[in-house]
Amino acid sequence: MIPKNPRQLADLVLKPIITEKATRLLENNKYVFEVVPQATKPDIKAAIESLFDVSVIKVNTVRPPRKKKRVGRFIGYKPLYKRAIVTLQDGDTITLFPEV
């Protein structure tokens, strides 16, 4: 269910992910964001379109497996997260780095 409140839409997208692979995807007009694990593809599409005022063509999601983390003799896990790869329409861009 797509939330109608703009504040709820803004809470779905946590932060942009800037890695080598994500930077290569920028050339194909694809942007990578970390989103809450419960977010669905229509929710992510509505959130990106309302936050950045762009047209989204496609949304792909990835939930990488959790990694083990050891603290002393105790073994725990890193938190679960979800990535969204958002493809924008030609001509639309998102400014991740504001120009100084």
UniProtKB/Swiss-Prot annotation:
PROSITE patterns: RIBOSOMAL_L23 (PS00050). InterPro entries: Nucleotide-bd_a/b_plait_sf, Ribosomal_uL23-like, Ribosomal_uL23/eL15/eS24_sf, Ribosomal_uL23_CS. Coiled coil: none annotated. One of its GO terms (biological process) is translation. Keywords: Ribonucleoprotein, Ribosomal protein, RNA-binding, rRNA-binding. GO terms for molecular function: rRNA binding; structural constituent of ribosome. Signal peptide: none annotated. One of its GO terms (cellular component) is ribosome. SUPFAM superfamilies: Ribosomal proteins S24e, L23 and L15e. Belongs to the universal ribosomal protein uL23 family. One of the early assembly proteins it binds 23S rRNA. One of the proteins that surrounds the polypeptide exit tunnel on the outside of the ribosome. Forms the main docking site for trigger factor binding to the ribosome. This is Large ribosomal subunit protein uL23. It comes from Rippkaea orientalis (strain PCC 8801 / RF-1) (Cyanothece sp. (strain PCC 8801)).
